[in-house]
């Protein structure tokens, strides 16, 4: 788990960057919330990305890992979803998942093209229903922002559904798995609602 002083340093850096941007751009409240969320996300993700990319290079799996990571992170940026409370555990699981899944898929024949497309469309339905999955870590009060994120999540899922036709079988399978991973992180765990505070 991260030391308190390390977390404090990240919070201070985030606040300073946000204050500088806010001072120069005079953002509206909704825009300011998105910028702050973006800064926090980037500062939390960078260490995980570095570790993941190093492992991918060691296993000679950089392109598949980047495809998996990119498709997941783009969609998750709109769908939101649960987070682990421990940064250390999150870093370990991130590296294992982003590197392990593409590495294992290379030893399979992948999923047939038409079946991949059907799976993508089937996954788009619950992703559209439950996005954005608001949590304690990422609360969203604005209904207009929720609607905008929901629409973007649906459009992104549909784009990936067609994009998987343009790549190799293994890369197409990786895109499908990225949608599946997003789905597992936004599907409700308690009470039938995806935006409950209990769904960390």
UniProtKB/Swiss-Prot annotation:
Enzyme class: hydrolase
Membrane topology listed for this record: Multi-pass membrane protein
InterPro entries on file: AgrB (IPR006741)
Cellular compartment(s): Cell membrane
Spans traversing the lipid bilayer: 49-69, 88-108, 114-134, 148-168, 171-191
GO terms classed as biological process: proteolysis; quorum sensing
The entry's keywords: Cell membrane, Hydrolase, Membrane, Protease, Quorum sensing, Transmembrane, Transmembrane helix
GO molecular function, one term: peptidase activity
One Pfam family in the UniProt entry: AgrB
Primary residence: membrane
Keyword Transmembrane: yes
EC number per UniProt: 3.4.-.-
GO CC annotation: plasma membrane
The protein's role, per its UniProt record: May be involved in the proteolytic processing of a quorum sensing system signal molecule precursor.
Family the UniProt entry places it in: Belongs to the AgrB family.
Protein name: Putative AgrB-like protein
């Amino acid at each position: 788990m991260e030391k308190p002083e390390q977390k404090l340093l990240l919070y201070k850096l985030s606040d300073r960057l946000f204050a500088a941007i806010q001072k120069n751009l005079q953002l509206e409240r909704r825009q300011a919330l998105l910028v702050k969320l973006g800064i926090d996300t980037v500062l939390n993700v960078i260490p995980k990305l570095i570790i993941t990319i190093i492992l991918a290079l060691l296993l000679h799996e950089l392109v598949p890992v980047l495809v998996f990571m990119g498709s997941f992170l783009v969609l998750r940026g709109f769908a939101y979803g649960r987070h682990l409370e421990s940064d250390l555990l999150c870093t370990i699981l991130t590296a294992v998942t982003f590197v392990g899944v593409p590495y294992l898929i290379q030893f399979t024949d992948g999923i047939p093209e038409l079946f991949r497309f059907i799976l993508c469309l089937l996954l788009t339905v619950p992703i559209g229903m439950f996005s954005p999955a608001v949590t304690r870590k990422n609360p969203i009060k604005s209904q207009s922002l929720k609607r905008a994120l929901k629409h973007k999540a649906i459009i992104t899922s549909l784009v990936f559904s067609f994009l998987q036709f343009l790549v190799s079988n293994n890369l197409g399978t990786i895109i499908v798995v990225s949608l599946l991973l997003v789905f597992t992180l936004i599907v409700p765990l308690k009470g039938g609602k995806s935006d409950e505070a209990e769904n960390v």
